[in-house]
């Protein structure tokens, strides 16, 4: 691989687990790391411990919430980008900062890999004008990228996951042959998070206090999965949807604390009092927090005819393995978090495909010899169930495919292996650095952004006491 001078913006839990590890596999490291001044000690200690010879630059905390970088920071970055001859940048900050850095980097012609969500306006659950910003900011960045011919990649690993690639190939081929769209699709995801009332109000990593939640966290991946699975580019123009209709419901922290009240927490954690937290509840402190769960029915239409009906069931309040009050040091992956993921997709009378992927153990249990991680409950459990109308399309009437069989055996045997999802992230990173990405370009997320915008507009309506229905023309 040709010399890459990589700027890493944000060295948090995700960047350490995905980007530092992924770059090491390629024999690379970031030449420059930028983070908040409040993280200076942690960043320097990590770089020293892992022998990463990166230069560092630390910025004031007030920069993290700006829509555009301050003139001073822009000048500092101009100097650093030139001095280090930066060719590639990875944005792995808290999402509120994404927009400012993207607006700075794209006009410079620096190839960018950004974490999801692409941008993250605050208070999108409560203010219509903020929810609309999701689409406006995306359109602005798309225009910038087009104008400056700057490659921008979004880290959405399911676009690179060989298991989902296998499914999209089946779906795409069938749509092309019969010109029949995906008829029904159901997607379920539960991320296994379980937060105390205090954590909901204080978290900075995957926060809720800024008026956004699940949809900007792991939920983005599954809205994007729905967009990807529709394979709209394979439909003839006259069947391609031109309108989205969405109706939703959401479960907020105040809803959860009504159900999981003070006696509940006292029972499970044996703590004498949660008076402070539940006084905050009575004062309405939790009312404007972001959503924990989101459920929605979506209809994609063409000339008022239904093309596809989709349901989303995206949870942060579902099954978890956490059974302790004091959070673990690693709250990202080792705090009781387990994933349940399923998809059910039907193409008329021709085909039904189901995905089943259910964990019961945590990442920290990967090396436990008592687990077969490819079985139900294991970290890598993933099955594809396929049902075919053989009289029309041929093939096997029923087929069960183990997800692991779609990967080379060497992947799981690699000492650096930490899961197939992460192997897909590695592939995204490698394609980005090689300049060969064509699966998760900024422009590929247009439909995802439409759905995301409509979802938050629906949440706003519900919180304003209105019927949570949104009708939106598709761009």
What are the roles of these predicted feature ranges?
Residues 199-362, 443-447:
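Rossmann-like dinucleotide-binding domain that binds NAD(P)(H)
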Residues 1-108, 122-139, 474:
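N-terminal glycine-/serine-/threonine-rich beta1-alpha1-beta2 phosphate-ribose binding loop
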Residues 89-90, 112, 185:
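Receiver (REC) domain switch-region micro-motif
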Residues 120-197, 212:
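A contiguous active-site-proximal alpha/beta segment in oxidoreductase catalytic domains
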Residues 108-111, 147-150, 304:
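A short helix->loop->beta-strand "cap" motif at the edges of active sites that frequently abuts
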Residues 109, 115-118:
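Short helix/strand-capping hinge loops at secondary-structure junctions
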Residues 329-475:
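C-terminal helical cap and adjacent loop that interface with cofactors, partners, or active-site loops
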